[in-house]
């Protein structure tokens, strides 16, 4: 299918049979296509330096207590086992200095680093307030550490999710999405 605009032919897509499926295309004075993507900066380049992220939700601002509570409720509603882990700022991100390697291969843990577990996994936990009180206790004991909540599925024997519940006050790694782009 081709569209003729300003005496120029633009090939759209060969498989389109419905006119409604064809995107609106026009050519500006300089001869470039005007599409929705070109009108806004849809295709952005992310800053490759100091743009570290942790697992689920790491692209968002730090979660509030209410948002964490909703996530805990979701974890418990699915009968998953919550577990708290913490790590010092210099050990939180994967790197050659803090990864466990066995010869030329890395360990079998998902991201090659181990965080210290806070107590034991909360097997049989049915009340979200128990998890929230453990988060508060861990934060009080280690205020300058990263703390994440992970959950495990006992049936599939896998880690289902993991997300930060506390960033140290001294952390400078989080950047707003607008600041991550070039």
Swiss-Prot record:
Q: Where in the cell is it found?
A: Plastid, Chloroplast
Q: Which domain of life is it from?
A: Eukaryota
Q: Which cysteines are joined by disulfide bonds?
A: none
Q: Which InterPro entries match?
A: RuBisCO_ssu, RuBisCO_ssu_dom, RuBisCO_ssu_sf
Question: Where is it chiefly localized?
Answer: plastid
Task: Extract the transit peptide range from the record.
Answer: 1-41
Q: Name one GO biological process term.
A: photorespiration
Q: Which Pfam families does the record associate with it? A: RuBisCO_small
The record's keywords, sorted A to Z, are: Calvin cycle, Carbon dioxide fixation, Chloroplast, Photorespiration, Photosynthesis, Plastid, Transit peptide
* Entry keyword Zinc-finger: no
What CDD domains does its record include? Answer: RuBisCO_small
Keyword Transit peptide on entry:
yes
Entry's Gene Ontology cellular component terms: chloroplast
GO terms of molecular function: ribulose-bisphosphate carboxylase activity
Q: Which family does it belong to?
A: Belongs to the RuBisCO small chain family.
Q: Quaternary state and partners of this protein?
A: Heterohexadecamer of 8 large and 8 small subunits.
Q: Which PANTHER family does the entry mention?
A: RIBULOSE BISPHOSPHATE CARBOXYLASE SMALL CHAIN 1, CHLOROPLASTIC (PTHR31262), RIBULOSE BISPHOSPHATE CARBOXYLASE SMALL SUBUNIT, CHLOROPLASTIC 1 (PTHR31262:SF0)
The UniProt function text for this chain reads:
RuBisCO catalyzes two reactions: the carboxylation of D-ribulose 1,5-bisphosphate, the primary event in carbon dioxide fixation, as well as the oxidative fragmentation of the pentose substrate. Both reactions occur simultaneously and in competition at the same active site. Although the small subunit is not catalytic it is essential for maximal activity.
Further remark:
The basic functional RuBisCO is composed of a large chain homodimer in a 'head-to-tail' conformation. In form I RuBisCO this homodimer is arranged in a barrel-like tetramer with the small subunits forming a tetrameric 'cap' on each end of the 'barrel'.
This chain belongs to which protein, by name? Ribulose bisphosphate carboxylase small subunit, chloroplastic 4
Q: What organism does the UniProt record list as the source?
A: Acetabularia peniculus (Green alga)
Q: What is the lineage of its organism?
A: Eukaryota, Viridiplantae, Chlorophyta, Ulvophyceae, TCBD clade
Q: Which gene encodes it?
A: RBCS4
């Amino acid at each position: 299918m081709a569209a003729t605009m300003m005496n120029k032919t633009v090939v759209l897509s060969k498989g389109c049979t419905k006119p409604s499926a064809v995107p609106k295309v026009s050519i500006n004075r300089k001869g470039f296509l005007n599409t929705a993507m070109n009108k806004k900066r849809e295709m952005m380049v992310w800053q490759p330096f100091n743009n570290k992220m942790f697992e689920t939700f790491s692209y968002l601002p730090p979660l509030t207590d209410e948002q964490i509570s909703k996530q805990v409720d979701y974890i418990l509603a699915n009968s998953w086992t919550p577990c708290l882990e913490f790590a010092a700022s210099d050990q939180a991100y994967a790197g050659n200095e803090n990864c466990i390697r066995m010869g030329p291969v890395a360990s079998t843990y998902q991201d090659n680093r181990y965080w210290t577990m806070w107590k034991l996994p909360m097997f049989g936990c049915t009340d979200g307030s128990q998890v929230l009180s453990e988060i508060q206790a861990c934060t009080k004991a280690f205020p300058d550490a990263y703390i994440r909540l992970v959950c495990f599925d006992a049936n599939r024997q896998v880690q289902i999710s993991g997300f930060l519940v506390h960033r140290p006050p001294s952390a400078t790694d989080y950047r707003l999405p607008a600041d991550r782009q070039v």
